[in-house]
């Protein structure tokens, strides 16, 4: 069983912001598996489930807002008894150029409040799929930057990155994490 979490903020005003790249990616991946989201208030998230090659995949989008994502993650993790090694978090990363992707297991949170929240409830030994959204320019506040919408060229670049993640997601199901890491880079 895999738990795949896309980080973002609920609400139409945040839908296509840099901070919601995790939501955008997880919707595309879940759609690839013909799985659609429904709200589960007891888990504080939207959830979609599917089975692929005999393996259950649970996709979630926390509805707690970014800074409290751990609340949703711990409730789903506990209910389904999922080990951190089987948890994959997809999130924005300002330390990567727009559209660049990095995969890693464990490590620090890089100042990302969604990851801080998750680390606080399950530790940090889970998998991360980091999608670059670039750095703010001209002394722009980081919070303002990540809560702003992508420019059209940025959005196209990010969608190409998400397409690479989606088309190679099956490698995660086959536990070929190193190959996944190389194919998405």
UniProtKB/Swiss-Prot annotation:
CDD domains: PTH
Record keyword Ribonucleoprotein present: no
Keywords assigned: Cytoplasm, Hydrolase, RNA-binding, tRNA-binding
Active site: 19 (proton acceptor)
EC number: 3.1.1.29
GO biological process: protein quality control for misfolded or incompletely synthesized proteins; rescue of stalled ribosome
GO molecular function: peptidyl-tRNA hydrolase activity; tRNA binding
Recorded catalytic activity of this chain's protein: an N-acyl-L-alpha-aminoacyl-tRNA + H2O = an N-acyl-L-amino acid + a tRNA + H(+)
SUPFAM superfamilies reported in the protein's UniProt record: Peptidyl-tRNA hydrolase-like (SSF53178)
Keyword RNA-binding among UniProt keywords: yes
Gene Ontology cellular-component terms listed: cytoplasm
Binding, tRNA: 14, 65, 67, 113
Residues flagged as site, Stabilizes the basic form of H active site to accept a proton: 92
Covalent S-S links between cysteines: none
Subcellular location: Cytoplasm
Site (Discriminates between blocked and unblocked aminoacyl-tRNA) residue list: 9
Source species, domain of life: Bacteria
Principal EC category: hydrolase
Function according to Swiss-Prot or TrEMBL: Hydrolyzes ribosome-free peptidyl-tRNAs (with 1 or more amino acids incorporated), which drop off the ribosome during protein synthesis, or as a result of ribosome stalling.
Subunit structure, interactors included: Monomer.
Membership in a protein family: Belongs to the PTH family.
NCBIfam families attached to this UniProt entry: pth (TIGR00447)
The protein, known as: Peptidyl-tRNA hydrolase
Taxonomic lineage: Bacteria, Pseudomonadati, Pseudomonadota, Alphaproteobacteria, Rickettsiales
């Amino acid at each position: 069983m895999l738990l795949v979490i896309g980080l973002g903020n609920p609400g139409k005003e945040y839908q296509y912001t840099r901070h919601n790249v995790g939501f955008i990616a997880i919707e595309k991946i879940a759609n690839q598996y013909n799985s659609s989201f429904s709200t589960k208030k007891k888990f504080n998230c939207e959830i979609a489930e599917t089975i692929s090659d005999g393996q259950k995949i649970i996709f979630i989008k926390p509805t707690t807002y970014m800074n409290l994502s751990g609340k949703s993650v711990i409730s789903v993790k506990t209910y389904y008894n999922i080990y951190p090694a089987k948890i994959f978090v997809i999130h924005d990363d300002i330390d990567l150029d727009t559209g660049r992707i990095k995969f890693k297991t464990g490590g620090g949170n890089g100042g990302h409040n969604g990851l801080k929240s998750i680390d606080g409830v399950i530790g940090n030994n889970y998998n991360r799929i980091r999608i670059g959204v670039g750095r703010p320019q001209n002394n722009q506040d980081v919070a303002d930057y990540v809560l702003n919408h992508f420019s059209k060229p940025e959005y196209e670049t990010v969608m190409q990155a998400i397409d690479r993640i989606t088309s190679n997601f099956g490698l995660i199901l086959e536990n070929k994490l190193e190959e996944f890491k190389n194919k998405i880079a």
